Structure formats: C-alpha cells, structure tokens
C-alpha cells in the first residue's frame, strides 16, 4: 500500500498520509486513555480500602449469638460483605494485629461467645512461632466450629506460617481455608499492596468462609 503511493498525486499522497497519521494518533490516544482509566480505577479501589481500614471494628456481643469473627485488617476489610450474608455476633479486628495481640483479644472476648462458631485469620503481619499458634488454638478449642484462614501475604514467612496453621488446624479439627491456594493466580483480588482485598477478593474470601459454616441440619444436630 505504501509502495503504491508514489504513483498517486501529491494531494492524494498527502491525504492518505494524514489519514494514517490520524489512525496512529487515535490508537495512541486510546491506549493512553485505557492506561489512565486503569490508574484511576486502582486509585478508587485504594481509597475504598483506606476508608474501610481507618477504624478498627469492635462490636458488642449480640444477645442472639452469631458468628465470632476476629483478626487483622483483612478481616476488617471483609466485615460488611460477611455481615450482609450472615449473622455476626461479635467482630474484633484491627490493622496490623499480630499473633500475641490476637491471643489476648481472644481471651477477653471468649466469655461472651461460648457456643459460637469462630472465624479468624492468621499469619499476615508477623512470622508466627509454634508457641503462638499452639496457644491460640488451645484457647479456642471448645468452640463448636473453628474456621481459620491462612495467609497469601507476599512475604518470606508466608509458607512457614501456613505450615504451622495447617498443623494446628488438623490437630484441633479446625476448618482450614487455604486462602493462599484460592487466591493463587488471581491478582484481581488484591489492592496494590498484594495483601488487602478489593471487592472481587472480598467476595471470594467470604465465599470461602460461608462454604465452611455449619448448615441448618448441622446446627440442629450440634455438629
């Protein structure tokens, strides 16, 4: 096509070259617009995450029971979606919470939540020790159902932490949600830090939790 242009008039050549120029500029413009839109969407999701995580979530236990939910900022970020689907009796979550603090929080809240399913996450904010994980599971062993979520945090301690969590989940008969495996290959679940969840990740996380909750028949039979 370009080789044939030399046999056309100067006016035709100019017009055709200008047309090619417009196509190139339009393509560049569309690419730039898409990039800007992607950045804007990322900024919007990041702002939503920041708003959700500004305040810790600590609620008073409800008289009618419900789920006992505790953990760090990932739990904090999924609380509204979980609350929209299930009855939460108590939630106690905070940004940056580590295992030592989690153990103390569990001890303080335990008296009010006897008979409730407990949902907790572990391993995002520090390298766990065997003593810490053992103490946490020992403290909650009498709950009728324990649901523990492991970590997908992009840190060097992730696999080591998850091995400890799996060991004690098996020992105490807990339901283990392998968030590391579930989220593998799904960057769209995470915000820019690779830890906190955007809406798609929140839904997947809560889906995994609700799949492990006791059914009505199990509750009736005391399982």
Mark where each language-model region is:
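A short helix->loop->beta-strand "cap" motif at the edges of active sites that frequently abuts
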Residues: 142-145, 174
């Amino acid at each position: 096509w370009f080789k044939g242009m030399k046999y056309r008039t100067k006016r035709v050549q100019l017009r055709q070259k200008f047309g090619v120029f417009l196509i190139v500029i339009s393509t560049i413009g569309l690419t730039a617009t898409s990039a800007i839109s992607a950045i804007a969407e990322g900024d919007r999701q990041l702002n939503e995450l920041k708003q959700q995580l500004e305040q810790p979530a600590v609620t008073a236990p409800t008289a009618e029971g419900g789920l006992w939910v505790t953990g760090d900022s990932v739990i904090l970020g999924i609380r509204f979606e979980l609350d929209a689907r299930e009855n939460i009796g108590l939630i106690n979550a905070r940004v940056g919470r580590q295992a030592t603090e989690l153990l103390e929080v569990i001890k303080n809240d335990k008296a009010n939540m006897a008979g409730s399913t407990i949902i907790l996450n572990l391993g995002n904010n520090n390298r766990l020790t065997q003593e810490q994980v053992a103490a946490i599971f020992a403290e909650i062993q009498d709950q009728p159902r324990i649901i523990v979520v492991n970590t997908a945090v992009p840190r060097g301690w992730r696999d080591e932490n998850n091995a400890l969590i799996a060991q004690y989940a098996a020992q105490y008969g807990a339901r283990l949600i392998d968030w590391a495996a579930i989220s593998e290959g799904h960057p769209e679940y995470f915000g820019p830090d690779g830890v906190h969840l955007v809406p798609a990740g929140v839904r997947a996380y809560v889906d995994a939790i609700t799949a492990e909750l006791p059914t009505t028949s199990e509750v009736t039979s005391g399982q």
